[in-house]
Amino acid sequence: MANNFTTPLAASHGNNCDLYAHHSTARILMPLHYSLVFIIGLVGNLLALVVIVQNRKKINSTTLYSMNLVISDILFTTALPTRIVYYALGFDWRIGDALCRITALLFYINTYAGVNFMTCLSIDRFFAVVHPLRYNKIKRIEYAKGICVFVWILVFAQTLPLLLKPMSKQEADKTTCMEYPNFEGTASLPWILLGACLLGYVLPLAIILLCYSQICCKLFRTAKQNPLTEKSGVNKKALNTIILIIGVFVLCFTPYHVAIMQHMVKTLYAPGALGCGVRHSFQISLHFTVCLMNFNCCMDPFIYFFACKGYKRKVMKMLKRQVSVSISSAVRSAPEENSREMTESQMMIHSKASNGR
């Protein structure tokens, strides 16, 4: 792709700038990070999905959005083993461009499906708390089903074109996959990325902040009208949950999108200033902020655990049941083992006695 659409800026960069000079450090830290994300993300989200499916008869709009968020996280974790190997080899992709495109697809599906479903959750909570009479449970679940289908269609429409474009690039001694330098020669890339950041991050963040600020105002008004709600601690828990959700969203998604936007603005308005040092710094910032953004799939199960009382209770119940099963099986196997050892000893004694006679 970079060979077909080159700009004067790309041509002026030359081929002497090593944008992967940090690979010796990255090949250690990034595989460790993504291994952690893979284990925690897969186990945590599978556990959340099991709990949701077991209680599907009691499903509501909030649970439905959460389930779709969990599914997008699980899809993302399936792509991580290949990325772990890629980073461990020092940014060398050895399994073909087709798999590179698929991992890119799963990456962007997780990113923007996650953002969209978190936005849906904030809107859903807004109507449930601020305007409860406008949307009863039946209507909200029906609307939620349609919205989930629409979100998936929108995300796939945005990401499926990635399968049509080469995602890998042959460098001097390696093949890189899904790296920004592979596409920086595309003339329209800055505008595409700025548009994606505005629609995929700035707009959802504005909606989330607006919805949760209105919810907080409603909770404060309710506490003033009824002091018992403040004493019960319900409002405090709700506010802590809101702070947790906004904090995770801002911490995980903001650094990546800010890094992209500021670099694209530089590319458009000060192309001459983008020397090798600036480009390499941006490449390092991308790797760091992408790691931070991907850590979001580990945080989602913890949000469910602390925010949803029913989910927390179900998880603890499952863990207790598993522990009790393990203990009972261990206790049951111990007498069997002792009995087997005693039987073998008795047979040996009987055999020796027979030989003595």
Curated annotation (Swiss-Prot):
Glycans are attached at N4. One of its GO terms (molecular function) is G protein-coupled receptor activity. Residues 344-357 have a biased composition (Polar residues). InterPro entries: GP183-like, GPCR_Rhodpsn, GPCR_Rhodpsn_7TM. Disulfide bonds join C100-C177. Residues 1-32, 90-101, 165-190, 262-287 are extracellular. GO terms for cellular component: plasma membrane. Homodimer and heterodimer. Heterodimerizes with CXCR5; leading to modulate the interaction between of CXCL13 and CXCR5. This is G-protein coupled receptor 183.
